Amino acid sequence: VPQIRLIGIATLLLASGHAFAANVRLQVEGLSGALQKNVRAQLSTIESDEVTPDRRFRARVDDAIRDGLKALGYYEPTIEFDLRPPPAKGRQVLIARVSPGEPVRIGGTDVILRGGARTDHDYLDLLKTRPATGTVLNHHDYDSFKKSLTNVALRKGYFDSKFNKSQLGVALDRHQAFWDIDYDSGTRYRFGEVTFEGSQIRDEYLQNLVPFKEGDYYQTKDLAELNRRLSATGWFNSVIVAPEFEKSRKTKVLPLHGVVSPRTENTIETGVGYSTDVGPRVKASWKKPWMNSYGHSLITNASISAPEQQLDFSYKVPLLKNPLEQYYLVQGGLKRTDLNDTEADSTTLAVSRYWDLSSGWQRAINLRWSLDHFTQGNVTNTTMLLYPGVMISRTRSRGGLMPTWGDSQRYSIDYSNTAWGSDVDFSVLQAQNVWIRTLADRHRFVARGNLGWIETGDFDKVPPDLRFFAGGDRSIRGYKYKSISPKDDDGKLKGASKLATGSLEYQYNVTGKWWGATFIDSGEAVSDIRRSDFKTGAGVGVRWQSPVGPIKLDLAVPIGDKDEHGLQFYIGLGPEL
């Protein structure tokens, strides 16, 4: 019987505790701003069902409040508890009334730097961030300062750095705090020899990817840049370049050792897609990321749709002096087109020299050869061309596959002359731009502009691929793909020698990865600028931020066109830049 009675009492006490927990709410009064925020963070570990009015719980709350205030320089708060009766429909409230008291203020910050830190501007700049005398003590400032000293050491190669002393002293009777730090950075390490293991590419090509010289001071950004460059070549499946510390303790010269593994020699990709401009499309690509020890690579692509069938290749030859940023590109292909009033068979071959600059700009000079047999409207021709050109471009973006910020710019000039065997003289100038900006995360703006100009004395001999047509996605929505250009006497499209199109689009993030869009496109494709014929289309659309890039659906109609009235829809997948 006594055992039964004890069990009953224990059960009653447990039930009573749960009843209190379920009927008591904690409330802290007297704090605001950073003090309130920090105390709330300390109390956030307390679950609502743990709140009770007993002495043990009050002591727990008292400790948490004091810890939160102490971190911000308030060492002597006054804390009083009061249990408020429940309202008509509610729970009892355990109130903690807090008076922070007088804060502890900085009385001095004594920081001694030894070793290379005495003359290193990054360390000297850190000294300027110390709190001024009289500032309220903040433990985070002290801890952050010490962490910053360590971060500079790791970033710049002071691998023997240490704290001889680091104390935060508090004199409560004077309400003052004192920093006392004695820090020795030691000697700064330098880069040593860089070696590689597992590479199928000649060592001299890899050495010319190293962005620093042996003997340069160590910096983590240089090591990261080396890893990035090796990965960016596309030659390797994995890249790890790491310091060999055990070989450098005495000399302070840090050798690096890179372990790489070759990328698969052959990759084949196939896909089926759809776009409104060309309809269903089958694509295949064969990629050889490296073909020999000189790092040559090959990409072959095939694309088949109802209006266009194309087979092309691109052979890349990196230059020894700068394999990543300077290279030759040999390109060629076959293309057949049967679209609107265009029928064409084209064979092309081009040799280009590229410079990919660290600023992000890409420059190229090229020499192209092409043989085109085509019918455009009522005119049939066979044209052989040999023409040089120059191109400069840059693409920047932030925010992943659906950038929140970015721009793409491309400018090119091509020149053909019968003096070296071309069938026609011409000059072609083109400029293409896209800008993306986002405001307040939910408002996205996309602007596009395209300009083109052909100067020639025999336009009929210019192949359709060099002529300008407008209409369709990324041009003037509301019109069919490449349906805007001057027409001949029979009403067939001829293509234009002048092009100007622009687009403004606003997108709003409706929810999650879904965006709504509204847009207006305008422009013209003409051969005589004195006979301006601007076309305008406007519409609405939906964007879905898929894992492989934005997928879009647009509906658009022509504006103010007496000959075109129909609704056009556009489906597309791919980058906007």
Give residue ranges: language-model regions.
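Gram-negative/organellar outer-membrane beta-barrel architecture
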Residues: 116-122, 219-410, 437, 474-478, ...
